[in-house]
Amino acid sequence: MGPSVSVSERKRQAIAAAALTLFARDGYERTSVDAIAAEAGVSKRTVYSHYGDKENLFLLVVKDTYELMRERFAEVVERTLTDVDDVEKSLVSCIREAIATVSQSPERSTLIRLVLTELPRFPVLMDLWRNRAILPLLGAPIARLAAAGLLNADDPDQAADHLSALTLGQVNNRSMMGTVPITDAETDQIVTSGIRVFLCAYGVRRD
């Protein structure tokens, strides 16, 4: 049984979820604190006590959602790319799961729509995006695989960039950043073919 969550924390989570939904649906300008409070089932005063004002609420909700995506990705990478025997199988498992739990998650689709809409109003969103990018999380496990003689990657970060472009990037393009559904078969084809191309460049050839 997990740790109990305080009433205050439950209210904060409800406010954040309501704010993300309403900001994405109605835009920052048209979303009122009254509407967020009503959606969350709390008082307007409670919203202000947790987040200060609407702008601070908006930025914190975006930051927290970015962080949630990053934590999910890190957990997938750690679980699937530790103690690797079959590199291709492990990479396919990692990327497939990352797509299912991160790239195509409802939260990410909502976040992408929100950021693209509000970026002109809040240029700081680009900094939040860069500072919490998930791509660097692939560099360390690729370095470990290279050190173990399972990959030939002199520059693990560049290899991570290539792996992402061939798999996650292609899925993002096909699904318009997770806002348009694509089939599991399409996703599998992109992932498996992308990883095979990646291994043509970075795989260790066995004689």
Q: Residue ranges of each PLM-predicted region?
A:
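Hydrophobic/aromatic-rich alpha-helical bundle segments in the mid-to-C-terminal region
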Residues: 146-196, 206-207
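Helix-turn-helix
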Residues: 14, 18, 22-56, 60-63
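N-terminal intrinsically disordered/low-complexity leader segments
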Residues: 1-10, 73-74, 154, 206-207
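Short, basic, alpha-helical segments at the C-terminal edge of helix-turn-helix-like DNA-binding modules
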Residues: 63-69
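Hydrophobic alpha-helical connector segments
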Residues: 74-108, 112, 159-160
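Short helix-capping/turn signature of helix-turn-helix
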Residues: 28, 51, 114-122, 133-134
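Amphipathic alpha-helical packing segments from all-alpha helical-bundle domains
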Residues: 104, 110, 123-148, 157
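Amphipathic alpha-helical segments used for helix-helix packing
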Residues: 102-127, 172-177
